[in-house]
A protein has these predicted regions:
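Positively charged n-region of N-terminal signal peptides that target proteins for export
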Residues: 1-4
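Active-site-proximal beta-strand/loop segments in catalytic clefts of secreted hydrolases
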Residues: 44-48, 88, 136-141, 166-169, ...
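C-terminal motif of bacterial Sec signal peptides marking the signal peptidase cleavage site
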Residues: 15-16
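Short, solvent-exposed loop/turn elements at domain surfaces
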Residues: 48-56, 76, 143-147, 212-219
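Extracellular/periplasmic catalytic domains that process cell-envelope and extracellular macromolecules
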Residues: 32-36, 123-131, 153-158, 195-199
Length: 238
């Protein structure tokens, strides 16, 4: 199990294995029945780490969607989007892709942030739904922590957003990983939480980056200003 450390995630503007096939493609309505904008989410499982493979299944991806829908809220606990499972690509399918993303991530050396978007765009040159966000589940590596690292990142990628989510942050583990990174996808930056400890309730986008305290629990919803940024960024995506 990886170390539970406080992770500073980055954004770029550059801010048991299953054989189940990807979910069938189809037109996705842009608005749910309750009026919330729909965000199609594609999960791509890119690691065959023995510890991670138990999460490489359709049921886990459904669970991750439920987590996003439950915790991606404003400070009055109002839901903002309707996240919907669009596609799921298991490791078995990912491993057959003919692109260099496999050499860019899950390797015993740090990723090169500047080259990741180009590799992703080569593997997935076209998005299959409006506003689609791709979440790549991977095994983070750093010189200091080796594969114990859990750093996750979000890239807005010129209108083709994606997330690198360390597998150990599935199940809402370690500072609301997927929810925090989805905040970056929709334009948000880190905020400071002075004197916060690991158990302090904090804003979803809180970070230890400012050196004034821990990022805390990241369990408090988005402020009105943050919500405005989220909705504005949503409108900018094709």
């Amino acid at each position: 199990m990886k170390k539970t450390l406080l992770v500073i995630t980055g954004t770029l503007l550059c801010v048991s294995c299953t054989t189940r096939p990807p979910l069938p493609l189809g037109e996705t309505s842009k608005v749910s029945t309750d009026g919330r904008p729909i965000i199609p989410v594609t999960f791509v499982f890119t690691t065959n780490s023995p510890e991670a493979t138990k999460f490489d299944n359709y049921q886990q991806m459904r669970k991750e969607i439920k987590i996003l829908n439950k915790y991606y809220v404003d400070d009055k606990n109002n839901k903002i989007f309707k996240f919907k499972l669009h596609r799921y690509i298991p490791y078995e399918e990912f491993s057959k892709l003919h692109c260099d993303l496999k050499q860019q991530i899950n390797q015993p050396y740090p990723i090169t942030i500047e080259t990741i978007p180009a590799s992703v765009n080569t593997c997935f040159p076209k998005r299959t739904a409006s506003k689609e966000v791709i979440v790549f589940i991977y095994d983070a590596y750093s010189t200091k922590w080796k594969f114990e690292d859990v750093t996750s990142r979000a890239f807005r990628n010129n209108g083709k957003p994606f997330i690198l989510l360390d597998w150990n942050r599935l199940n809402y583990n370690i500072q609301a990983g997927s929810v925090h990174e989805m905040g970056h996808v929709f334009g948000l930056k880190h905020v400071c939480a002075p004197k916060a400890t690991k158990r302090t309730p904090t804003n979803i986008m809180a970070s230890a980056e400012c050196k004034l305290g821990s990022g805390g629990l990241r369990n408090l919803g988005f402020t009105p200003v943050q919500l405005q940024t989220i909705l504005s960024t949503y409108k900018q995506y094709p």
